[in-house]
């Protein structure tokens, strides 16, 4: 579950990758599976981690940096140097828990917008690590939520698509200069 990629946890003056924001078509595409885990993928994962830390995030999906690949990086405790980040390549949720929980989410691709989203509290996920080895983890709480949020990005879904409170959604998007028409409601 730990990552073998060494990255300093901290803000860089110039993050290596550029974030894309709500309204950008790249965020609405279904990302492509990664056929081979190689140095190019490991470099992308490292740069994604550096970008995530520089942006003060706890998760980042490749489409958020304009890369159409099924790769996510996560660190739910970025202030703790002992907590290793996760790199999940071709992640797939195999099982959802029965208990649903509302929790406030935000997104590096929609800065300043924070709204409640209801998601399963527990999941089981299969993926490949940065060496290409198959892995499977059970996650609950914050880790479960971040994995689900980032996998949504890989499928062209953004957290605002899942927000049920339309009044709060419209208000926050407008305050931050985002268009409500960029939201694609999940039925």
UniProtKB/Swiss-Prot annotation:
Q: Where does Fe cation bind?
A: 107, 149, 153
Q: Which Pfam families match?
A: Pep_deformylase (PF01327)
Keyword terms, alphabetized: Hydrolase, Iron, Metal-binding, Protein biosynthesis
**Active-site residues annotated for this sequence:** 150
Alphabetically, which GO biological process terms does the record hold? Answer: co-translational protein modification; translation
Annotated catalysed reactions: N-terminal N-formyl-L-methionyl-[peptide] + H2O = N-terminal L-methionyl-[peptide] + formate
Cofactor dependence is on: Fe(2+)
Q: Which GO terms describe its molecular function?
A: metal ion binding; peptide deformylase activity
* Superkingdom as given in the UniProt entry: Bacteria
InterPro entries assigned: Peptide_deformylase, Peptide_deformylase_sf
EC number(s) in its UniProt entry?
3.5.1.88
The record, for SUPFAM superfamilies, names: Peptide deformylase
Cofactor comment: Binds 1 Fe(2+) ion.
Record function comment: Removes the formyl group from the N-terminal Met of newly synthesized proteins. Requires at least a dipeptide for an efficient rate of reaction. N-terminal L-methionine is a prerequisite for activity but the enzyme has broad specificity at other positions.
Q: Which family does it belong to?
A: Belongs to the polypeptide deformylase family.
Name of the molecule in the record: Peptide deformylase
Q: Which organism is it from?
A: Picosynechococcus sp. (strain ATCC 27264 / PCC 7002 / PR-6) (Agmenellum quadruplicatum)
Q: Which gene encodes it?
A: def
């Amino acid at each position: 579950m730990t990552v073998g990629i060494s990255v300093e946890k901290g803000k860089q003056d110039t993050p290596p990758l550029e974030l894309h924001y709500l309204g950008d078509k790249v965020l609405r595409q279904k990302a492509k599976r990664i056929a081979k885990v190689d140095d190019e993928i490991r470099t992308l994962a490292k740069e994604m981690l550096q970008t995530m830390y520089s942006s003060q995030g706890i998760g980042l999906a490749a489409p958020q940096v304009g890369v159409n690949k099924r790769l996510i990086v996560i660190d739910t405790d970025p202030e703790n140097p002992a907590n290793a980040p996760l790199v999940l390549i071709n992640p797939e949720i195999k099982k959802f828990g029965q208990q649903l929980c509302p929790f406030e989410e935000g997104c590096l691709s929609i800065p300043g917008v924070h709204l409640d989203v209801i998601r399963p509290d527990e999941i089981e996920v299969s993926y490949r690590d940065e060496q290409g080895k198959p892995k499977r983890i059970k996650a609950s709480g914050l880790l479960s939520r971040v994995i689900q949020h980032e996998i949504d990005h890989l499928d062209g879904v953004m957290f605002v698509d899942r927000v049920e409170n339309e009044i709060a959604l419209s208000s926050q998007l407008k305050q931050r200069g985002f268009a409500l028409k960029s939201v694609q409601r999940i039925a």
